[in-house]
């Protein structure tokens, strides 16, 4: 084959012109002349391969030249034929025939391929190549075989441990540890592919003008890292910041993000310490202009960082540390990972749908952990499909696997194979596969099964993640039916270890009481925990969420004893009032036999019933006949300042157990006549007494009943309602 025939084969497939050294090879290994590529890019505003339609992400100038074409052209121009016997041989490769000719004729050295050595060496200086450190025979069919000392032309880098190269016209894969890289491959541009839609056109443009909007499968050029969860990138002619969890970076972009992570974090912390409370005045304009983190208008603008950090703090909270109460409402826009969809649907939500991240702590009798309630909008209910928590520690067995630590949060991206999942760690940010039996869904309904009390000596309370349509204003008012919110209320429970609370029963209590029923009729969508073990105080968790502006003060307890009366074993005073606070909710305060208080806040009513079986069967001592015990029921003053009449309740001897009463709402201002329970003969030993406290909401829509069976015989008397604003009925047993 002569030189003219060779030049006829070297033509561009598009324009059929002769190829020269300026021809560029695309990532799909197709070669075209530079003018054709420029015309394609100018016409379509993007560069795709004319044959296979593969999209090219880099510029035309950054494309490499075809090394084989360059060598062929150099050989033709120098007058040396590189084709011998119908087979192509690389320059600088000494064959056995050339070696014999070199020994027989010294002049043949001038015509041997080694005369091309200086020319080829000058060209090879810019070619990515590596030198073999050992013999490698390969284990798979696609592996490259070479000997120690061979020079391998590098084609591309698969990952940190594998290369694809060529030697003697044969291409294959080989490990990076078996070669020494002489000339590194040109690094591909740091690019990332969008996994989800990120569009903020419906939000406030003034706050989100620095965000880079994109759609799924868009390719973004990474410029730098802003902070732990945000990066700066370029898409077309637009430059802005975007959440890192929304994209999948390539190897170059991953190295760039990891390299600048520590520097950007330290820089952000330094700027946050130097920033003054008045952010309107830029004291250090040059520093803020250089920092990409200064583009964020405020700490509450992007809630994705806040949501992730809140989840990590709840997952990794130490057992001896109580959760901090978060009271500031956080705007959860579409930048939150909870807005992510599995199939790339557009995440369009109302601009005004805001959620309040708050924690509610009921006050137990003894110090310890309390129930935390975190509320987010109901539009993010699909967050339950991909949020998991590691149950056990797992060490990765391969490079594609993900290390897990107990309690670590993971966002699952999909199933890899049977028994394996693929996800990204919310702590390290790494992506990999892991066994499915090592994790549990955070927002799964099956987590409710774990919210039980395994032992009365080691009780636990449940952390409630409530997805509710209700809203609590900063003044603590409870509203419902907001048109901006929709979806049912649901709660999921995550067990949290707590310290055992003290027993609320006094020393005179014989036996343990079991709380049978705890119900809370708060509006329409209340959620309630039901204890399943005995001897455990009830922690009431409902749909009512109290903001820090709501203050619930326990009523003061006073001891009252009538004149000319022997001291009663348990003389107490109970005040039941619906104090007019900003929430419009009644506060029920009662005192136990041991003098310890329990305060509950209810939306409308609370019903508690308890039964206790006495150990001893002997009858209780009768109270003195001269002075029966009495209890003063003092109603609270209403809003208009009108004082209500103080009622005194006296006990009747040996009255039967009173039946349950329901306090109906007042319909008029007339006082009802008290219904006196007639006394009867004492029943057998099995008869039990009960103490009933009835109270009603101010509006009179609901009523509550609290029953505590502590003694065997009961003395009761009903008290009429004192006003239209409050209905109180107190029934107490004597000792």
UniProtKB/Swiss-Prot annotation:
Subunit and partners: Interacts with FASLG and PPP1CA. Interacts with PAK4 and TNFRSF1A. Interacts with DLK1, MAP3K10, MAPK8IP1/JIP1, MAPK8IP2/JIP2 and MAPK8IP3/JIP3. Interacts with RAC1 (both active GTP- or inactive GDP-bound forms).
Xref: PANTHER family: E3 UBIQUITIN-PROTEIN LIGASE SH3RF2 (PTHR14167:SF60), SH3 DOMAIN-CONTAINING (PTHR14167)
Function: Has E3 ubiquitin-protein ligase activity. Acts as an anti-apoptotic regulator of the JNK pathway by ubiquitinating and promoting the degradation of SH3RF1, a scaffold protein that is required for pro-apoptotic JNK activation. Facilitates TNF-alpha-mediated recruitment of adapter proteins TRADD and RIPK1 to TNFRSF1A and regulates PAK4 protein stability via inhibition of its ubiquitin-mediated proteasomal degradation. Inhibits PPP1CA phosphatase activity.
Domain of life where this protein originates: Eukaryota
Protein family according to the UniProt entry: Belongs to the SH3RF family.
UniProt keyword Transcription, yes or no: no
Region (Disordered): 260-301, 335-373, 472-534, 612-637, 649-735
Residue ranges of the region described as Interaction with PAK4: 373-466
Alphabetized Gene3D superfamilies for the sequence: SH3 Domains, Zinc/RING finger domain, C3HC4 (zinc finger)
Subcellular location: Nucleus
Phosphoserine found at: 655
Name recorded for this polypeptide: E3 ubiquitin-protein ligase SH3RF2
Pathway(s): Protein modification; protein ubiquitination
Main location: nucleus
Zinc finger (RING-type): 12-53
Notes on the domains: The RING finger domain is required for ubiquitin ligase activity and autoubiquitination.
Organism the protein comes from: Rattus norvegicus (Rat)
EC class of the enzyme, as a word: transferase
Residues annotated as domain SH3: 125-184, 187-252, 383-444
EC number annotated for this UniProt entry: 2.3.2.27
A GO molecular-function annotation: zinc ion binding
């Amino acid at each position: 084959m002569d030189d003219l025939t060779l030049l006829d084969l070297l033509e561009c497939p598009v324009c059929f012109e002769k190829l020269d050294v300026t021809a560029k090879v695309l990532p799909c290994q197709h070669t075209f002349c530079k003018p054709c590529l420029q015309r394609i890019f100018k016409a379509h505003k993007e560069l795709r391969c004319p044959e296979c339609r593969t999209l090219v992400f880099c510029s035309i100038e950054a494309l490499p030249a075809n090394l084989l074409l360059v060598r062929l052209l150099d050989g033709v121009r120098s007058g040396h034929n590189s084709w011998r016997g119908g087979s192509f041989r690389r320059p600088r490769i000494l064959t056995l025939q050339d070696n014999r000719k070199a020994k027989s004729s010294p002049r043949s050295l001038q015509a041997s391929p080694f005369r091309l050595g200086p020319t080829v060496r000058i060209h090879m200086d810019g070619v990515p190549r590596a030198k073999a450190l050992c013999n490698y025979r390969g284990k798979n069919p696609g592996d490259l075989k070479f000997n120690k000392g061979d020079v391998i032309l590098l084609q591309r880098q698969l990952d940190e441990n594998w290369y694809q190269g060529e030697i003697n016209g044969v291409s294959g894969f080989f490990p990076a540890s078996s070669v020494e890289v002489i000339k590194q491959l040109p690094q591909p541009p740091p690019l990332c592919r969008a996994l989800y839609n990120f569009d903020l056109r419906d939000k406030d443009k003034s706050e989100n003008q620095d965000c880079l909007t994109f759609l799924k499968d868009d390719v973004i050029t990474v410029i730098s890292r802003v902070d732990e969860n945000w990066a700066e990138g370029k898409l077309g002619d637009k430059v802005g910041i975007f959440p890192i969890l929304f994209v999948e970076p390539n190897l170059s972009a991953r190295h760039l993000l990891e390299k600048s992570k520590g520097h950007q974090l330290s820089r952000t912390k330094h700027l946050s310490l130097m920033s003054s409370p008045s952010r309107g005045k830029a004291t250090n304009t040059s520093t803020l202009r250089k920092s990409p983190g200064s583009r964020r208008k405020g700490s509450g603008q992007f809630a994705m960082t806040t949501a992730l950090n809140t989840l990590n703090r709840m997952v990794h909270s130490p057992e001896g540390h109580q959760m901090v109460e978060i009271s500031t409402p956080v705007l959860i826009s579409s930048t939150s990972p909870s807005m992510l969809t599995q199939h790339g649907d557009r995440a369009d939500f109302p601009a005004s749908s805001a959620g309040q991240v708050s924690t509610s702590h009921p006050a137990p009798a003894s110090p310890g952990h309390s129930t935390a309630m975190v509320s987010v909008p109901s539009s993010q209910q699909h967050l339950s499909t991909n949020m998991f928590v590691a149950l056990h520690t797992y060490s990765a067995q391969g490079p594609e696997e993900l290390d897990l630590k107990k309690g670590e949060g993971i966002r699952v991206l999909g199933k890899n194979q049977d028994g394996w999942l693929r996800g990204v760690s919310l702590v390290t940010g790494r992506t990999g596969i892991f066994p499915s039996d090592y994790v549990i869904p955070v927002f799964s309904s099956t987590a409710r099964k774990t919210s039980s009390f395994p032992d009365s000596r080691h009780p636990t309370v449940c952390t409630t993640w409530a997805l509710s349509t209700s809203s609590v204003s900063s003044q603590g008012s409870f509203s419902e039916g907001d048109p901006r919110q929709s979806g049912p209320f649901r709660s999921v429970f995550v067990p949290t270890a707590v310290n055992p609370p003290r027993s609320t029963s006094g020393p005179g209590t014989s036996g343990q009481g079991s709380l049978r029923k705890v119900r809370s009729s708060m509006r329409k969508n209340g959620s309630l925990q039901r204890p399943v073990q005995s001897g455990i105080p009830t922690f009431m968790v409902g749909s009512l969420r109290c903001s820090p502006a709501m203050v619930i003060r326990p009523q003061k307890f006073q001891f009252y004893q009538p004149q000319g009366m022997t001291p009663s074993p348990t003389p107490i005073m109970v005040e039941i009032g619906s104090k007019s606070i900003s929430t419009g909710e009644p506060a029920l305060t009662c005192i136990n036999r041991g003098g310890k208080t329990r305060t509950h806040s209810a939306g409308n009513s609370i019903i508690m019933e308890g039964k206790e079986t006495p150990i001893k069967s002997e009858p209780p001592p009768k109270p003195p006949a001269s002075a029966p015990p009495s209890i003063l029921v003092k109603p609270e003053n209403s809003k208009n300042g009108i004082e209500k009449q103080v009622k005194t309740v006296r006990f009747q001897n040996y009255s039967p157990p009173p039946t349950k009463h329901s306090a109906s709402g007042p319909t008029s201002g007339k006082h009802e006549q008290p219904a006196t329970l007639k006394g009867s003969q004492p029943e057998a030993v099995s008869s039990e007494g009960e103490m009933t406290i009835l109270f009603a909401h101010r509006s009179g829509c609901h009523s509550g009943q609290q029953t505590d069976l502590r003694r065997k015989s009961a003395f009761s008397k009903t008290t009429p309602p004192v006003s239209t604003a409050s209905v109180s009925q107190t029934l107490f047993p004597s000792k």
